Every structure is written in C-alpha cells, then in structure tokens.
Amino acid sequence: MGAPKQRWTPEEEAALKAGVAKHGPGKWRTILRDSDFSALLRLRSNVDLKDKWRNLSVTAGGYGSREKARMALKKGRRVVPKLTAEPMDVDVKDMDDAHDTAIDVEPLAMAFESLPTEESPDKSVARLDDLILEAIRKLKEPSGPSKAAIAAYIEDQYWPPADFQRLLSTKLKALVNSGKLIKVNQKYRIAPSPPPSGRIGTKVSSAEGMKAENNNAKRLTKHQVIAELEKMKGMTKEEAAAFAAKAVAEAEVAIAEAEEAARVAEAAENDAEAAKAFLDAVTLSMRNRNAASMMLRAC
C-alpha cells in the first residue's frame, strides 16, 4: 500500500496514463501487474491509481470546486458511469495541489454534477437492471456469476451510491421472481428466451396442409380414365407431359395411402392375435383351476 499523501512524480503519472491508454480506465490491478509499469508504480496501490486518475480527469473536465460537489450531492444519488475523458496536459504542481484540496470530495459528486437532476427514480432502477444484465454477459461464467462478482464488476466500471449493496440484492431478487434471471447455487444466469410461437404454428399448418392435399387427391373411376385417355389423343407433347406428371403424382399419393392402410391393418391383426393368445391363456388357466378344485372336492 502506498502512502495516500505522497506526491506523485512525473514518471509515475506518465506510467499511469500509459497504463490507462493500454488497458483502459478501471483496470488498476492489471496496470500494477503489467511489467511495463510495475517498476514505476511499485509504491502505489489500485486505490492510489483510481484516486489519481479521478483527480486527473476531474481537473481536465473543469471540475474543481468543493461547493459544486456538495450541491451535486444534495440533488440525489444514482449509479453513474466513471469518467473516461482523456486528461489534458497540465502542470505537475497544479496536479499535486488538486490532489491535496479535492481528495476528500466524494467521487459520486464529481460525476453527478453534469447529469440531469429531473430524472425519475424509476429510470435509475431500470438502469440498474441493465447494469446487472451487462455484468452477467461480460463476465461470461458458465454457471453464472455470483452476487459478489456482479457487484465487483459494477463497482469497478461505475460509481455506485452508498446503498448499492441493498439495491443490488433487491433488484436481483426482483429479476429472479420476474423470470428474467435464473438463480442456482447463489449464482445468476440470464433466462433463455422462449422460442417464437410462429415457428411451431408454421410447422403445424404445413403438416395440416400436406394432409389435406393428400386427402383431396383425385380417385378416378374406369369411365373417367377412358375419358382422360380420349382427351390425351388431341394433346400436344407439352400438354401430354404435364398430364403424365400429374397422373404420376396422383399415383404416388394413392400408393402411399395404400401402404399406410396396409400398415394399419397389419398392426390391427397383430393386436388381434395378441388378444386371442391372452384369452386362450386365461381360458386354460381357468380350466386348470376348475379341475384342481374338483379334485380337491373329490378327496
């Protein structure tokens, strides 16, 4: 742990800026573990990096008044994204002065100042829903992240309010009860969306349409066949080919129906044989039982 009040050197600030440019803001532990920056930042902790980067961003964005921060705190609390603006080139002495004068101001107030104050609490709650779903998607754990992992992700990416843990517990319970999340062994996963009902309806209607088409197939009598043959004598080659294709299709339908009827008849015959065998066995058993009873009575 580095000393909080120890002044930052230009080399440390340069290493911090380079680390943020390489890994992004919020990845403080990753920056400290990076061999390119670990030597220069060996006296600093992840909290030191976060505070210093916040002060650099605040100064670059024009926020430096304690009074503005206190007024922003009175307007309300909500989960807000962390500031990610690139810091401007400023004098090192000014940075140290800003660190000494603004370090005790809560970071939520800094980020809250530029946000609209008339937003309703319902919108804040809805935004917390989005943050929870975002955390689950980004963490990509097979069995789902725990509540602690979700909270750590949101705290690492955003500035949560003081009662964040209570709000998170309430919101997770509500999402589970509404069916949006699935909770198994204290871990949370996004519930799979149900398949569109249109696909099932399409398959059913398609099957019904094929069945109706088969039922409507023409069944020609002998006289109709003779009439069709007479009609074919005056046809061209194209008309005759189309007529023949139609006849083949109707024949295939008839063959399929005949095969289905044969299968049904065979199944019925097998059922009848099984029923007859069962009846014969019962009859034989009854006869043997009656014979045994008569023998006992005779004795």
UniProtKB/Swiss-Prot annotation:
A GO molecular-function descriptor: single-stranded telomeric DNA binding
GO BP of this protein: nucleosome assembly
Record-annotated H15 domain positions: 124-192
Protein name from the UniProt record: Single myb histone 1
Gene: SMH1
Keyword DNA-binding in record: yes
UniProt cross-references to SUPFAM superfamilies, sorted A to Z: Homeodomain-like (SSF46689), Winged helix' DNA-binding domain (SSF46785)
Listed InterPro entries: Histone_H1/H5_H15, Homeodomain-like_sf, Myb_dom, SANT/Myb, SMH1-6, WH-like_DNA-bd_sf, WH_DNA-bd_sf
Biological role stated in the UniProt entry: Binds preferentially double-stranded telomeric repeats 5'-TTTAGGG-3', but can also bind to the single G-rich and C-rich telomeric strand.
